[in-house]
Amino acid sequence: MKLGMNIRNWGPTATPGFLTECAQYADRSGLDAIWFNDHVAMPPSLENNPYGIPQDMGDIVDPLAFGNFLAGITSRIEFGTGVLVIPYRPALLTNKLIASIQVLSGNRFLLGIGPGYLDEEFKALGVPRTRRGKITDEILTLLNESSKNEIVNSNGQDVALKPRLPLPPIYIGGNATVAIPRAIKLGHGWMPVSSSPDELKPDIARMHEQGAAAGRSDLKTVHMKTLPLAERNEAIDLACAYQAVGVDHLVHTQGYDSPAHYAEVVDQVDGEIRAGLK
């Protein structure tokens, strides 16, 4: 099982120097990937906040801009969005930005995507929330087609998208029933929201069963979870439990207040947790 960690592209940690120190330390470690998230325009107050978003996230660096930043300051580690809210962005521009990250990073980008949920952000961006699933499928279809064809059609216009997209692994985020079928049809795996190993086990099995029926034996599961690192044995047992139910890439998420603190957590995940995996 691969191991990753979050890197916060928001708040007081989202400065060039802070992000560079953290990303380059992770790059020098044996950590497999670092992950970051997406918000475009946060309202001053939230009516619906199921994921406990901080009321004031401070500065939020765009994840695709951050991906290009990481491409230039790292050389080995993979990095990805957990998740990119894909209906927020125009299809062709999204394709261009992802292709640019892939080219500049040597194909190290991992694309976790989600259809979004925040009513206020959809309203601010002028995107109908009711069409988020359809828009998501349209953009994923374009990404897949542009990685295979020199010419693609967008809004009735044939265009050549260059650089041609080296398709990154696409992980479909969320626990909605449509996520797994979408992953099988248009992605490379599933990225569920924080769930226990027992909760994930039947869904991962269902994904592989349905995937096999569709000729897809390559599907992976990426899962983000805050491991109880202060309790070493408990954290190792939990990581092993995720591995046992079929999680392919476990991402530890937590806050940190300095590059040195970030480095300590990276060392715990890449050292103690990795050593404890079966």
Model segments located where?
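Active-site-adjacent structural elements that line small-molecule/cofactor binding pockets in enzymes
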Residues: M1-K278
